[in-house]
Curated annotation (Swiss-Prot):
Catalytic residues (positions): D71 (proton acceptor)
MF-aspect GO terms: dTTP diphosphatase activity; UTP diphosphatase activity
Site positions (Important for substrate specificity): R10, T72, Q155
InterPro entries, per database record: ITPase-like_fam (IPR029001), Maf-like (IPR003697)
Subcellular location: Cytoplasm
EC top class named in words: hydrolase
Disulfide bond entries: none
Stated role: Nucleoside triphosphate pyrophosphatase that hydrolyzes dTTP and UTP. May have a dual role in cell division arrest and in preventing the incorporation of modified nucleotides into cellular nucleic acids.
Major location category of this protein: cytoplasm
Keyword list, A-Z: Cytoplasm, Hydrolase, Nucleotide metabolism
Entry EC number(s): 3.6.1.9
Cofactor: a divalent metal cation
Name under which the protein is recorded: dTTP/UTP pyrophosphatase
Length: 190
């Protein structure tokens, strides 16, 4: 059985599009970046930590379990934008992203007890239009930025702010479907 180690409703929705039966494992994994840790290493480590934590929860009941872990972070330069802690934090993130191109890093990892992990790192580039303070305040007030890396949901109201996207739309949402499908096939789970 395939298990998704994520609380994200977006990842659940995206994984359903691949027509693979799965169950969701609810867990909390610390997402703390070390001072000297690169953004790409960080996002891959967190995805692997989630997958291993999920496997630890289900392996006794399902020795053949395959667990998918994923993490998405928004990166501008060397600054990693996680999920905003409050509306003011969301506003600060959106101001920083306004009129600029940033990267969205999404790591996907598959683990099981019988083989080495398989993983992919998908890097997309997103360019925001210039946003004025009124646009930023209105978007932050709608609540959508909360719980989203970089304080925006590309599939929601923020889509109108995106001038250009290069890479994986589903990866920016939280689970790059092409790469996930390829990993599942290689792992024998698709």
């Amino acid at each position: 059985m395939l298990y998704l180690a994520s609380r994200s409703p977006r990842r659940q929705e995206l994984l359903q599009r691949l027509d693979v039966p799965f169950q969701t494992v609810q867990l909390d994994v610390p997402e703390l970046r070390a001072a000297d840790e690169s953004p790409d290493h960080y996002v891959q480590r967190v995805a692997l930590d989630k997958a291993h934590a999920g496997l630890a929860l289900v392996q006794a009941a399902d020795p053949d379990a395959i667990v998918l872990g994923s993490d998405t972070e928004v990166v501008l330069g060397e600054r990693v934008f996680g999920k905003p802690v409050d509306v003011d934090d969301a506003i600060a993130m959106l101001r920083a992203l306004s009129g600029r191109t940033h990267q969205v890093l999404t790591a996907v990892v598959l683990v099981c007890a019988q083989r080495a992990p398989a993983q992919a790192l998908v890097v997309s580039e997103v360019t925001f239009d210039r946003l004025d303070d009124a646009q930023i305040a209105a978007y932050a007030a709608c609540g959508e930025p909360m719980g989203k890396a970089g304080a925006y949901a590309i599939q929601g109201r923020a889509e109108r702010f995106i001038r250009h996207l290069s890479g994986s739309y589903s990866g920016v949402m939280g689970l790059p479907l092409y790469h996930t499908s390829q990993l599942l096939t290689a792992f024998g789970a698709h």
